[in-house]
Design a protein with these regions (language model features):
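Conserved class I S-adenosyl-L-methionine
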Residues: 1-56, 69-73, 223
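C-terminal alpha-helical "lid/dimerization" subdomain adjacent to the S-adenosyl-L-methionine
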Residues: 32, 159-229
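Class I SAM-dependent methyltransferase SAM/SAH-binding core
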Residues: 61-63, 67-114
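A short acidic, Gly/Pro-enriched loop at the edge of an enzyme's catalytic core
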Residues: 113-124
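A short SAM/SAH-binding and catalytic strip from SAM-dependent methyltransferases
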Residues: 124-137
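A short glycine-rich, Lys/Arg-flanked "PGG" loop and its adjoining helix->strand segment in the class I
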Residues: 138-150
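Conserved beta-strand signature within the Rossmann-like core of class I S-adenosyl-L-methionine
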Residues: 152-159
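Core SAM-dependent methyltransferase catalytic element
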Residues: 212, 229-248
Length: 248
């Protein structure tokens, strides 16, 4: 059980994380729009579809939706999608992108670790590049398990950034060019305070999810399957994919 001091520290960290992503949201959204307008959107859509139940429409929760990339793809696929993010700036960007691409979905500002949904409400929970940013990834996984129906699927795409130090040089050479030095410093400081950064992933995630009641499969690196647009250069840290079915 968390002490009052631990809770206060976590809340302060959450505020820093929220402020960081608010500041990043406009340029981050520009990258996601480039993805949606380019060939990677079709790659992601095909890859996601291969791991979804055949039923349509599925009730899908996109956790840490950011600028709404997955929301756009999944609504195009005919599903009922709710996208949540702790950053108000990201939710604003997601709303703009949904409008730009002619999509409709339910977008809400919400903490990924404290979901305002009833038990077994969703068929699918999906997330991209979120869990490495969470103060308590374990609690988030518990919540995602709670809101999934029996037999539902959790798809998580993320990277193990624990031992990575983000630099201005790397940012200049990637899709995230233009991140200021102050934001990079804050990003590294936040990352180094997160417990998830001490774990080796996705092995840690798979072990935890199995204990929570999932049947788990994963790929150590799916980047070559979803990143093919040569105009978009990402970092070299492997992008893993976790596919977990709720069995109990």
């Amino acid at each position: 059980m968390k002490t009052q001091e631990m809770l206060q520290k976590e809340e302060a960290l959450e505020r820093r994380i929220e402020s960081y992503w608010d500041a990043r949201s406009p340029k981050f959204s520009a990258v996601r729009r480039r993805e949606l307008e380019g060939s990677d959107a079709a790659r992601w859509q095909k890859f996601i579809a291969s791991h979804l139940p055949e039923k349509k429409p599925l009730r899908v929760l996109d956790v840490g939706t950011g600028a709404g990339f997955f929301v756009v793809l999944l609504t195009r696929m005919g599903h009922e999608v709710t996208g949540i993010d702790m950053s108000a700036g990201m939710i604003d960007e997601a709303q703009k992108n949904l409008a730009a691409f002619g999509c409709r979905a339910d977008l809400r500002k919400m903490n990924a670790q404290q979901l305002d949904f009833s038990d077994e409400f969703f068929d699918v929970v999906i997330s991209r590049n979120l869990t490495w940013t969470l103060p308590d990834a374990m609690e988030a996984y518990r919540e995602w398990h709670r809101v999934l129906r029996a037999g539902g699927m959790l798809l998580n795409f993320d990277s193990d950034y624990g031992e990575t130090t983000f630099s201005a040089a790397d940012a200049r050479d990637s899709v995230h060019t233009g991140i200021g030095e102050a934001l990079l410093i804050e990003c590294n400081k936040i990352k180094d305070e997160l417990r998830v950064s001490t774990h080796r992933r996705p092995l840690w995630d798979a072990d935890l999810l199995e204990k929570l009641g999932f049947s788990v499969q994963y790929d150590a690196d799916i980047a070559s399957l979803v990143h093919g647009d040569e105009s978009l250069r990402y970092d070299d840290v492997p992008l893993f994919g976790i596919y977990a079915k709720k069995v109990k």
